[in-house]
C-alpha cells in the first residue's frame, strides 16, 4: 500500500524552494520529515522515551551526519564506512542543539534523540542551513512537550543584497555569513563571520533572516495541522513546594546578596556560597532532607540566582565588584616559549590562554573531506580546555563538541585577517590554562598576538569580548554586562561573543535564553561590545604593535617559486631521486603543487637555513634555465678541448654549452689553450640552435670588434674544389647503353 504523504513548500523568493514532507519514511519514529531543496534531501527523525530519568538536565542528543553515498562517493580510510563525525558535522549538531534545548521543559528528563541525515547532496545547496528546520518540523509532528516551532537560516550579502541560504559560490563573494535560529517572535541564536561589518549591518542581517524564518515556521504549522497534531504527552514532573521555596529563599537570599556584593574572587565566592548552602541544609532535620533534600538544593540555587541578578539590576554591581561596562584587568606577553614559531599569553581576570603558532607547507593543510564539501584549510585553530583550568579533575577523553565549537569561532574571527599571499600553512593552538568566563575570546586575543609574534603579516589585529544580559520582563529593567564571568554566563539571559578589528566585526556567536529580546537591547549590547573590544585591542597593541618583520630564527622560512609544468618531472627526477637528494643535501622541505589555472608548478621551499634555501633556488633555476636568443651571458670554462671549450652559465650552474674553437676570435685559433684556460670567466652571445648541429650555439667573437682589414672567408664550392666524384658512375650516367651483350646466359643446373 502506498503511504499517504503530506507536503508543504516554502518559496525562498528567488526561484528556489524548500519542501517539507512526511508520511513516507521512518514512520516508527515519533516524528519524521524529509526536507528537500533542489537535489539535496535531509531525513530527520525524533524519538523521546516515555520514562523519565532521575537527572537534573535533559539528556538530549542531536546527531547530524552526511552520508557519502549522498554524493556518490566512498568514505576515505581503510574500512570504507562512516565513522566518527567530522568537525563540520559536530558544528551543525551544536547549531541545532543550542536552539532546541531551551524549548524543552526544565523538568523534562526523558532520553531524547534528534537524528538528521543527508541522504542526497546537491552542489548548489549547503545542507546544514536546513538542519534546524528539519529538526523542528519533525518535533511538531511528535507529542513532545516543546514550547514552540523554530527554524534556522543562513544569511549572506552579495553586492549589498541579502540572500537566504546562499550557495557556496555566493558565499565566496559575500561579506556576511551568519546562521540565525529563531522562533516566530524571538531570535535565539546567531553565529557567523563577517568582513569587518558595522553593528548596524549585523542587526539588519539578523532582521532579514528572522523574516525568512517566520515563513518557514508557518509552513511547519500547516504541515502539522494537515498531518494531525498529537496531544502533548504527560510526564511525571515534580510539583513545586511553595512553602519550602519561601523558607529557603528567606534563609539564603540576604546572605547570598551580601557575598555577591563583596566583590570577592571566584574561589572565595564559591566557598562562601557553599557555606550558605550548608547552613540552609543544616536547618532541616535528617528526615526532612531525606524526603526533599534535592528540592532544598534546587530552591537554594533559585535564591542564589535571584540575589545575584537583583544586585546587578538594582545597584549596577556585579559578582566581582565591577560595573556593568567594565572589563577585567588584562596582562599580556609574547615570545614566551623559546622554541615555537610564535607564542603569547593573554590573561583577563581569572581567564588565561596560552597560544602557539606553527608554520608549515601546503602539505600541512587541514584536509576537509565531507560529502557536501571537499577542500583544505591553510589556516586553522585548535582550542583545548583541560580540566585543571577550572580546578577540576575529570576523565580526559577526546576532543569535546564544545572544544570544536569554541575553536571554530576563534578561527573564523581571525582567518579573514590572514593575507592571501601568506605562503605558509598556519596552525594556532590555544591552551586554556585558567577559565572564569570567555575563554574563547581569550583565545582570539592570544591568537592575534601569537600570529604577530610569529611574523605572520596580519592585515589588522583582532580582539574579542563576551557580553551578557540580565533582564526583568515584568519591570522592563535590563543590564548589559561586558566581559562576563562564568557565573554570569550561567545566571544571565544571554551569552553574546563579538570579535573584530578597530574597523568592524569579524565574527559573533549569540545564545539568548529569554523570549522577546528587543532589537533595541541587541543594538545597545553591540555598542557596548564595541567599546570593550577597542579597550582590549589597545592592550594587545601595547604588547605587540605590529607583526614582526620576519619569522623567528628557528622558524622555517618559506620561499615560493613557479615553474612551467614541463620542468616538474626534471625537478622530481626518476623515482623522486633528484628532489629527495636535494632535500637531504640542503636540509629543506620541498613541496610541489600544480596550478590548474596557469598550468604552472608551484614550488614551496621550507627551511631554517637561508643557505639551504638558496641552493634549492639555484637548482630550480638551473633546471628551468632557458637562454634567450641574442642575449649575452656570463660563463665559466669548466673543460678545455681540442675543438673548443665547455662552458657553464654562471646564472644557471649545471647548464653547459660548447664554445667552438671557431667562435673564440675573429683570427684563426690554432690552440684553444692560447685563448682560454680552465676557470676563466667570460661573456658569450647566445644564437639559439645551430641549424647544422642542432645544438646550442654561443660565440665569444661576436662580442669583439672585427680586426681592421678582416675579410670573411668565402664559403668553398665543394664541387669546384673536388671535381666530379662519380666519374660518370652517377645514377644519371651509369653507362647502361655500353653494357656488354656478349655475356653468356646463366645455365640452369636443374
UniProtKB/Swiss-Prot annotation:
UniProt keyword Transferase, yes or no: yes
Biased composition (Basic and acidic residues): 702-750
Top-rank EC class of the record's enzyme: transferase
One Pfam family linked to the record: S1
The protein's required cofactors: Mg(2+)
Entry's EC annotation: 2.7.7.8
UniProt-listed GO biological process terms: mRNA catabolic process; RNA processing
PROSITE patterns listed in its UniProt record: KH_TYPE_1 (PS50084), S1 (PS50126)
Binding positions for Mg(2+) per the UniProt entry: 489, 495
Keyword vocabulary terms for this entry: Cytoplasm, Magnesium, Metal-binding, Nucleotidyltransferase, RNA-binding, Transferase
All residue ranges annotated as the KH domain in the record: 556-620
Molecular function terms, GO-annotated: 3'-5'-RNA exonuclease activity; magnesium ion binding; polyribonucleotide nucleotidyltransferase activity; RNA binding
SUPFAM superfamilies noted in UniProt: Eukaryotic type KH-domain (KH-domain type I), Nucleic acid-binding proteins, Ribonuclease PH domain 2-like, Ribosomal protein S5 domain 2-like
Keyword flag Cytoplasm: yes
Subcellular location: Cytoplasm
Catalytic activity: RNA(n+1) + phosphate = RNA(n) + a ribonucleoside 5'-diphosphate
Region (Disordered): 697-750
Domain of life of the source: Bacteria
GO cellular component: cytosol
Residues in S1 motif domain copies: 630-701
NCBIfam families named in the record: polynuc_phos, PRK11824.1
Homology family: Belongs to the polyribonucleotide nucleotidyltransferase family.
Role summary: Involved in mRNA degradation. Catalyzes the phosphorolysis of single-stranded polyribonucleotides processively in the 3'- to 5'-direction.
Protein name: Polyribonucleotide nucleotidyltransferase
Species this protein is from: Christiangramia forsetii (strain DSM 17595 / CGMCC 1.15422 / KT0803)
Amino acid at each position: 500500500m502506498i503511504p499517504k504523504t503530506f507536503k508543504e513548500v516554502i518559496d525562498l523568493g528567488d526561484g528556489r524552494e524548500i519542501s517539507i514532507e512526511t508520511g513516507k519514511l521512518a514512520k516508527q519514529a515519533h516524528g519524521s520529515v524529509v526536507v528537500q531543496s533542489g537535489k539535496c534531501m535531509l531525513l530527520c527523525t525524533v524519538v523521546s522515551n516515555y520514562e523519565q530519568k532521575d537527572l537534573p538536565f535533559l539528556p538530549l542528543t542531536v546527531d547530524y551526519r552526511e552520508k557519502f553515498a549522498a554524493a556518490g562517493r566512498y568514505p576515505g580510510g581503510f574500512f570504507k564506512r562512516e565513522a566518527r563525525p567530522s568537525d563540520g558535522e559536530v558544528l551543525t549538531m551544536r547549531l541545532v542543539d543550542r536552539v532546541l534545548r531551551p524549548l524543552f521543559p526544565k523538568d523534562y528528563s526523558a532520553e531524547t534523540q534528534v537524528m538528521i541525515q543527508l541522504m542526497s547532496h546537491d552542489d548548489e545547496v549547503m545542507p546544514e542551513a536546513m538542519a534546524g528546520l528539519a529538526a523542528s518540523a519533525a518535533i511538531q509532528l511528535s507529542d513532545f512537550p516543546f514550547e514552540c516551532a523554530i527554524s534556522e537560516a543562513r544569511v549572506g550579502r552579495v553586492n549589498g543584497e541579502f540572500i537566504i541560504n546562499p550557495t557556496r559560490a555566493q558565499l565566496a563573494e559575500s561579506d556576511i555569513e551568519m546562521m540565525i535560529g529563531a522562533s516566530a517572535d524571538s531570535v535565539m541564536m546567531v553565529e557567523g563571520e563577517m568582513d569587518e561589518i558595522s553593528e548596524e549591518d549585523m542587526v539588519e542581517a539578523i532582521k532579514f533572516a528572522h523574516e525568512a524564518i517566520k515563513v518557514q515556521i508557518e509552513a511547519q504549522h500547516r504541515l502539522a495541522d494537515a498531518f494531525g497534531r498529537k496531544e502533548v504527552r504527560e510526564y511525571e514532573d515534580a510539583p513545586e513546594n511553595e512553602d519550602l521555596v519561601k523558607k529557603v529563599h528567606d534563609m539564603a537570599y540576604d546572605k547570598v546578596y551580601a557575598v555577591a556584593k563583596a566583590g570577592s574572587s571566584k574561589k572565595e565566592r564559591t566557598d562562601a556560597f557553599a557555606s550558605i548552602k550548608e547552613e540552609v541544609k543544616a536547618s532541616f532535620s535528617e528526615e526532612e532532607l531525606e524526603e526533599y533534600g534535592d528540592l532544598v538544593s534546587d530552591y537554594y540555587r533559585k535564591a542564589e540566582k535571584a540575589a545575584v541578578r537583583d544586585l546587578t539590576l538594582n545597584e549596577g554591581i556585579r559578582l566581582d565588584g565591577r560595573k556593568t561596562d567594565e572589563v577585567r584587568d588584562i596582562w599580556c606577553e609574547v615570545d614566551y616559549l623559546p622554541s615555537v614559531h610564535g607564542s603569547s599569553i593573554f590573561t583577563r581576570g581569572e581567564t588565561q590562554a596560552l597560544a602557539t603558532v606553527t608554520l608549515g607547507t601546503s602539505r600541512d593543510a587541514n584536509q576537509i573531506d565531507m560529502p557536501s564539501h571537499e577542500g583544505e584549510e591553510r589556516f586553522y585553530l585548535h582550542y583545548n580546555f583541560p580540566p585543571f583550568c577550572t580546578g577540576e579533575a575529570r576523565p580526559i577523553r577526546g576532543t569535546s563538541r564544545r572544544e570544536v565549537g569554541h575553536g571554530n569561532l576563534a578561527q573564523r574571527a581571525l582567518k579573514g585577517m590572514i593575507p592571501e599571499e601568506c605562503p605558509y600553512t598556519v596552525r594556532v593552538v590555544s591552551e586554556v590554562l585558567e577559565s572564569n568566563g570567555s575563554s574563547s575570546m581569550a583565545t582570539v586575543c592570544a591568537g592575534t598576538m601569537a600570529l604577530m609574534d610569529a611574523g605572520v603579516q596580519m592585515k589588522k589585529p583582532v580582539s574579542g569580548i563576551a557580553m551578557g544580559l540580565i533582564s526583568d520582563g515584568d519591570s522592563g529593567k535590563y543590564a548589559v554586562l561586558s566581559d562576563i564571568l562564568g557565573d554570569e554566563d550561567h545566571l544571565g539571559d544571554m551569552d553574546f561573543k563579538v570579535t573584530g578589528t578597530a574597523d568592524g566585526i569579524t565574527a559573533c556567536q549569540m545564545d539568548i535564553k529569554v523570549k522577546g529580546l528587543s532589537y533595541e537591547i541587541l543594538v545597545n549590547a553591540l555598542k557596548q561590545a564595541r567599546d570593550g573590544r577597542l579597550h582590549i585591542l589597545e592592550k594587545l597593541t601595547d604588547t605587540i604593535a605590529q607583526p614582526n618583520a620576519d619569522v623567528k630564527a628557528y622558524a622555517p622560512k618559506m620561499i615560493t617559486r613557479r615553474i612551467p609544468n614541463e620542468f616538474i618531472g626534471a625537478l622530481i627526477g626518476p623515482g623522486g631521486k633528484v628532489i629527495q637528494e636535494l632535500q637531504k643535501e640542503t636540509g629543506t622541505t620541498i613541496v610541489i603543487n600544480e596550478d590548474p589555472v596557469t598550468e604552472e608548478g608551484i614550488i614551496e621551499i621550507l627551511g631554517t637555513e637561508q643557505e639551504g634555501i638558496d641552493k634549492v633556488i639555484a637548482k630550480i633555476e638551473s633546471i628551468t634555465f632557458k637562454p634567450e636568443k641574442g642575449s649575452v651571458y656570463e660563463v665559466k670554462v669548466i673543460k678545455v678541448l681540442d675543438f673548443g671549450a665547455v662552458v657553464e652559465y654562471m646564472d644557471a650552474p649545471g647548464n653547459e654549452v660548447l664554445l667552438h674553437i671557431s667562435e673564440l676570435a675573429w683570427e684563426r685559433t690554432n690552440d684553444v689553450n692560447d685563448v682560454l684556460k680552465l676557470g676563466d670567466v667570460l661573456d658569450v652571445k647566445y644564437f639559439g640552435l645551430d641549424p647544422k648541429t642542432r645544438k646550442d650555439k654561443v660565440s665569444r667573437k661576436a662580442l669583439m670588434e672585427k680586426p681592421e682589414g678582416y675579410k670573411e672567408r668565402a664559403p668553398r664550392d665543394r664541387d669546384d674544389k673536388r671535381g666530379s666524384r662519380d666519374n660518370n658512375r652517377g645514377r644519371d650516367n651509369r653507362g647502361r647503353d655500353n653494357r656488354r651483350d656478349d655475356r653468356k646466359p646463366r645455365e640452369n643446373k636443374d
